[in-house]
Structures are given as C-alpha cells and as structure tokens.
C-alpha cells in the first residue's frame, strides 16, 4: 500500500471516533429516577425503542437494574479511588458521568464493561430471590452431578446466570447495535467482556448430609461470587486494556501497535489515550484533582506528587473519633472505648490559573 493511502487508514479510526455522535448509555440514569417502573421507563431520556419496550414489558427486571446501578457505580468508585479520575458521578446528568466518557478511552472501556456486568449480576440475583416473574433458579441444574469429590445432587437454587446474560445483552446492547460507527463497536466489545466476567466467578457451593457430618450425601448449587471479584478482575483488564484501530472494512479491530497481542473477547479495548485529569476541563469533562485527598507517604497513583500533578498540597490537622481499647467479654461481646485520634490530611492545591473553576 502506498504511503498516502496508508496515512488515510491510520487516521480513519480517529476520524470515525471524532465523528461519532455523543454516545452514552442513558439507561445508567435509571438508578436516579426512582418511582414506579412506568415512571422509570418514561422518564429516562435516550432509551431506544427496544429498550423502552423491554422496560414496559419487564418492570420487575427494570427495578433490579435500577437498584444495581448503585452497586456497580460504587464498585467503579472503589476501583478508581486512588486515581485522578475516580469514577465520580454527576447529579442531574442523564449520562451519569458527563462528557468524560465521550472520549473512547480506557476509562470508558471500564465503565461500559462494569455496567454491563452489573446488569447481569443484578438481574441474576433478582431471579434467585424470586423477584422476577419471567425467571427463577437455573432449571438446568437438576438431578445428579459429579465433581472431584464424587457424586452429588443438584439442589437449592442455582443462580440463573444465563438468563441474566441474555437479558443484559438484549437491553444494554440495543442502543449500540443501532450504530455502525467505531465507538458503537468498541462499546459492544466491552459490554460483552463485562457480561462474561460475571460468569467467570460462578462457583459451586455444597451442603453435606449424613450422620455426624459425614458428608455421605451432598447437595450442591451454583452461586455468583461477590461483585468485588468481578470488579477486581475488570480492574486488571483495565490496566491491561489494548489500544485498537478499526480494520479496513470497518467490521472489527486490529491492534494499534503491532507489538501487542490481538485482543480476546475477555479484553477491554479503547481507541484514544486518556487525558491527564489534572485540571477541570469543560471539553473533556474532567473535574480535576483540586481538593482531592492524597497520600504523602505513597509512591503510587494516590501519592501527593502524582494526584496533585506537581501543584503541591495543603495540610490540615483534624481529629476523629475511633474505637480503641477493645476487649472480648465472655460470652459473647466485644466492648470498646471511644478515643480521639489526631491526624494530618493532605489535599491537592488548585491550579494558579483562575480558569480552572469553569463549570464542566
């Protein structure tokens, strides 16, 4: 291929990304609407027709998804707690995260993956708890099975994760399937990676039956692990996310750097490098790090040097109430005293340029 054409193909992915309309998963706002399912379905802007139909047809599932938004956003904030961008959400913003996720960055890849995983987790859990009419426990886990410890009987309530994945795919992917641009393909890939991550941590739990706990008989079921497992796994995928470009026919990806491996279905992918998130920026949606607490003794991302972007920090002396002198009393209580602890809190200085306060 001659060099001018090669240059066009190198720039095409960026052009596709820049020309992509403002994309956001508006269903993320479902956690903030509250009220009945009809209120939720009619008041979340930006849902496509098939999403709104599913919303009206399955109000019990929508309640579970709405409650699940709090869980996966909290997990996102936990994973990013020591980073300049800390997965902060914006009140009264229908996109939940503002403009920051319009960039096809690693952060966007993570949020799309963990939100998709959050839907799988919330819907599957609601099924097992009998809160959804259209599903229940996994109907395939019946009869007997065999593992390394021998034969067992399927019993209890195995989490119906296949239903959760199927519903998440139909609902979450609906808006992206209508698009043919690069960002839609990126979102679909990361959505799928998120769904798959929940099933990865499905574990078998068993209960023993028999004389004196001999475990001559076992009843087993499949259960999802705590959502933190999924969050930790996707965090590792975020740190190993692969930068990609569109292939020449616009149907898939290829690695931006030939030295890196081709992404698998489990990997997160992104197009654009992230901003540094140091200062408040209306264009990128960054809220900056002014006022963020930093760790004076750390050498990691939460260190005052890194978190404050070299601007320095302020130190305040504060006291807080803690439990101390705890003692175990027979039987069966732990009694503690209330003590005041004095400590220094370090917070990042604001940029000297007054323009940093411009609203996002």
Swiss-Prot record:
PROSITE patterns: WNT1. Glycans are attached at residue 295. Disulfide bonds join 76-87, 127-135, 137-157, 206-220, 208-215, 278-309, 294-304, 308-348, 324-339, 326-336, 331-332. One of its GO terms (molecular function) is frizzled binding. The keyword Glycoprotein applies. GO terms for cellular component: cytoplasm; extracellular space. InterPro entries: Wnt (IPR005817), Wnt2 (IPR009140), Wnt_C (IPR043158), Wnt_CS (IPR018161). Residues 1-25 form the signal peptide. The keyword Lipoprotein applies. Belongs to the Wnt family. This is Protein Wnt-2. It comes from Callithrix jacchus.
């Amino acid at each position: 291929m001659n060099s001018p054409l090669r240059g066009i193909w190198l720039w095409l992915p960026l052009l596709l990304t820049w020309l992509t309309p403002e994309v956001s998963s508006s269903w993320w706002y479902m956690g903030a609407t509250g009220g009945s399912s009809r209120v939720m379905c009619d008041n979340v802007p930006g849902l496509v027709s098939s999403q709104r139909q599913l919303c009206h047809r399955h109000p019990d599932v929508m309640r579970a998804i709405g409650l699940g938004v709090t869980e996966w956003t909290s997990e996102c904030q936990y994973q990013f707690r020591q980073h300049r961008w800390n997965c902060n959400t914006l009140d009264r913003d229908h996109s939940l995260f503002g403009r920051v996720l319009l960039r096809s960055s690693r952060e966007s890849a993570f949020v799309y993956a963990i939100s998709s995983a959050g839907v799988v987790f919330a819907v599957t859990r609601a099924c097992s708890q009998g809160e959804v009419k259209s599903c229940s426990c996994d109907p395939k886990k019946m009869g007997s099975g065999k593992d390394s410890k021998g034969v067992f009987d399927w019993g209890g309530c195995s989490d119906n994760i296949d239903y959760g994945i199927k519903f998440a795919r139909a609902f979450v992917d609906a808006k992206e399937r209508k698009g043919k641009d690069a960002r839609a393909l990126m979102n679909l890939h990361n959505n799928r990676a998120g769904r798959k991550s929940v099933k990865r941590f499905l574990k078998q739990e068993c209960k023993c039956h028999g004389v004196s706990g001999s475990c001559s008989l076992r009843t087993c079921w499949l259960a999802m692990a705590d959502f933190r497992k999924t969050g930790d796994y996707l965090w590792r995928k975020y740190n190993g996310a692969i930068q990609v470009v569109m292939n020449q026919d616009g149907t898939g990806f290829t690695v931006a750097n030939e030295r890196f491996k081709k992404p698998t279905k489990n990997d997160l992918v992104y197009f654009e490098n992230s901003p540094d998130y140091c200062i408040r920026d209306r264009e990128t949606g960054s809220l900056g790090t002014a006022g963020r607490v930093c760790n004076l003794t750390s050498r990691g991302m939460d260190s005052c040097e890194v978190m404050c972007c070299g601007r320095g920090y302020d130190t305040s002396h504060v006291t807080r109430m803690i439990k101390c002198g705890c003692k175990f009393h027979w039987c069966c209580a732990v009694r503690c005293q209330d003590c005041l602890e004095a400590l220094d809190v370090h917070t990042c200085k604001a940029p000297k340029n007054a323009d940093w306060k411009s609203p996002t």
